[in-house]
Amino acid sequence: MDKSKRLFLKSKRSFRRRLPPIQSGDRIDYRNISLISRFISQQGKILSRRVNRLTLKQQRLITIAIKQARILSLLPFRPKAQRFKKAQRFKRSQSTV
């Protein structure tokens, strides 16, 4: 093959196939908190389909299950707020000039 055609060839990279996040035996249900909590972010938001790598149908079922679990207070609407220590503010000393 001459050099001009060699420039357009792409190198074949090997890739590792990722396992699906929901196995065939897993049941998407609002009572299955261990499964549902994998699809919630640190802030308590429902993660997007791209992040989850779910199908449209699975994402819809997960979203409905999360909302049901929140309403039935199995999951919090907001996670517990982290308590930050407030820095002590120093008062200005008044100087007489």
Curated annotation (Swiss-Prot):
One of the GO BP terms on file = translation
For this record, the Gene Ontology CC terms, alphabetical, are: chloroplast; mitochondrial small ribosomal subunit
- By its UniProt entry, which Pfam families does this protein fall under? Ribosomal_S18
Q: A single Gene Ontology molecular function, please?
A: small ribosomal subunit rRNA binding
Matching InterPro entries = Ribosomal_bS18 (IPR001648), Ribosomal_bS18_sf (IPR036870)
Q: Where in the cell is it found?
A: Plastid, Chloroplast
- Give the UniProt keywords, A-Z: Chloroplast, Plastid, Ribonucleoprotein, Ribosomal protein, RNA-binding, rRNA-binding
Q: Which family does it belong to?
A: Belongs to the bacterial ribosomal protein bS18 family.
Quaternary structure annotation from Swiss-Prot or TrEMBL = Part of the 30S ribosomal subunit.
Q: Which HAMAP family match?
A: Ribosomal_bS18 (MF_00270)
> What is the protein's name according to its record?
Small ribosomal subunit protein bS18c
According to its UniProt entry, this protein's organism is Oenothera glazioviana
